[in-house]
Amino acid sequence: MATADHQELLGGLIRLHVLHHAAEGELYGHWMIEELRRHGYRVSPGTLYPMLHAMERRGYLKSKVQGAGRRARRMYRATKKGRDALAFAKSRVRELFGELIEGR
């Protein structure tokens, strides 16, 4: 099965990937699409941008527009709530991946 067939299942991992980078510094949508592609995810703008907007509405990200006109970019950064959620998720992911990889 292709990655697109697993998109719903991978959505949580993609959100964690976004939070990870947004906690390290600012990011924008096109950069994030390329970053995800480097990790084997095929995410379209029609998938990523609604995800970013939803994460912002839920308080995990905050954004600001940099530049003007055609060069304007919406830059995203993790909020305290987003960084806290990422820390919590990391502990859960470590536990889960330990089970998946080691078969515990």
What annotation goes with each model-predicted range?
Residues 48-50, 54-55:
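Basic amphipathic alpha-helical segments that dock to polyanions
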Residues 39, 55, 93:
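The DNA-recognition helices of helix-turn-helix-type DNA-binding domains
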Residues 72-89:
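Basic, amphipathic "hinge/linker" alpha-helix immediately C-terminal to the N-terminal HTH DNA-binding motif
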Residues 86-104:
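Amphipathic alpha-helical dimerization/coiled-coil segments
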